[in-house]
Amino acid sequence: MGSVPIAEYGTPSTAEIPDHIEKYLPNYDAILLESHGALTWSADLLSAYHKMESLEFYAEVLYRTQMLGGGKELSGETIEKLYEVRRKMNLPGKHPANL
């Protein structure tokens, strides 16, 4: 899934929310809506659902990690190696991890 940005708060039932998320649509698969919740999208409903399930799982892991004292940040070199593995495996996704 890659990184998940946080969109600026928008008043419910107004154009503020779509205006704030529009810039993220071409480059991301998911977004957190400040003070609202999460949103995922894909070519079909089932794929979008699976992305939401993944996002919720990662959020739970992050929460538990923080409760246990925090995680260890990966080095830039390690992250680049992971991106290279992703490219070699031709994993799909529109997010910035497609370097």
Feature locations, PLM:
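Glycine-rich flexible loops
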Residues: M1-L99
